[in-house]
C-alpha cells in the first residue's frame, strides 16, 4: 500500500481514483497530477514503481495543498470571517446556512435535529 501525503492509497484501484482518497484532490487534480508525472490514469497503484510513487509525492507536496494544511487553512478562513463579524461569519457562528439558502423549512443538516415546541399540536 503506497503512502502519499500521510494517506494510505489503496493498491487495487486505478491511480486516478486512488489519488482522490487524499483530502483536497478531486477528479480534475488527480488527472492533472497523472499528466505531470506522465503516468497513465488507468494504471493500478500496485503496478507503480517506487520512483513513480516518489514523483507523485513530490508533485503533490510541491504544487498542491492537501490534508492537514488544507483543513487548517479552511478553519482559519472561517475563523477570520467570524472574527470580522460580517454576515457570513455570523451565519457560521450561529450554525445556519451561509450561502443564502432558505431556513424557514429545511436546512436541517446545518441546524441539527428539529427542536420540539411545547404545546404545538398538528
Curated annotation (Swiss-Prot):
Highest taxon in the source lineage: Bacteria
Gene3D superfamilies: 1.10.8.50, 30s ribosomal protein s13, domain 2
Pfam family, one: Ribosomal_S13
Keyword match Ribosomal protein: yes
Xref: InterPro entries: Rbsml_uS13_C, Ribosomal_uS13, Ribosomal_uS13-like_H2TH, Ribosomal_uS13_bac-type, Ribosomal_uS13_CS
Record region (Disordered): 92-122
One BP term from GO: translation
Keywords linked to the UniProt accession: Ribonucleoprotein, Ribosomal protein, RNA-binding, rRNA-binding, tRNA-binding
CC terms in the record's Gene Ontology section: cytosol; small ribosomal subunit
SUPFAM superfamilies: S13-like H2TH domain (SSF46946)
GO molecular function: rRNA binding; structural constituent of ribosome; tRNA binding
SS bonds (residue pairs): none
Known partners and oligomeric status: Part of the 30S ribosomal subunit. Forms a loose heterodimer with protein S19. Forms two bridges to the 50S subunit in the 70S ribosome.
Protein family per UniProt: Belongs to the universal ribosomal protein uS13 family.
Entries under HAMAP family matching the protein: Ribosomal_uS13 (MF_01315)
Function as written in the Swiss-Prot or TrEMBL entry: Located at the top of the head of the 30S subunit, it contacts several helices of the 16S rRNA. In the 70S ribosome it contacts the 23S rRNA (bridge B1a) and protein L5 of the 50S subunit (bridge B1b), connecting the 2 subunits; these bridges are implicated in subunit movement. Contacts the tRNAs in the A and P-sites.
Protein name: Small ribosomal subunit protein uS13
Organism: Maricaulis maris (strain MCS10) (Caulobacter maris)
Gene assigned in the entry: rpsM
Amino acid at each position: 500500500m503506497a503512502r502519499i501525503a500521510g494517506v494510505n492509497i489503496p493498491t487495487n484501484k486505478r491511480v486516478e481514483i486512488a489519488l482522490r482518497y487524499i483530502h483536497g484532490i478531486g477528479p480534475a487534480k488527480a488527472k492533472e497530477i497523472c499528466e505531470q508525472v506522465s503516468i497513465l490514469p488507468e494504471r493500478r497503484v500496485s503496478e507503480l514503481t517506487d520512483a513513480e510513487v516518489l514523483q507523485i509525492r513530490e508533485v503533490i507536496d510541491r504544487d498542491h495543498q492537501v490534508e492537514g494544511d488544507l483543513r487548517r487553512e479552511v478553519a482559519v478562513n472561517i475563523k477570520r470571517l467570524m472574527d470580522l463579524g460580517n454576515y457570513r461569519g455570523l451565519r457560521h457562528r450561529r450554525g445556519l446556512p451561509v450561502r443564502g439558502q432558505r431556513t424557514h423549512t429545511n436546512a436541517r443538516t446545518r441546524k441539527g435535529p428539529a427542536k420540539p415546541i411545547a404545546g404545538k399540536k398538528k
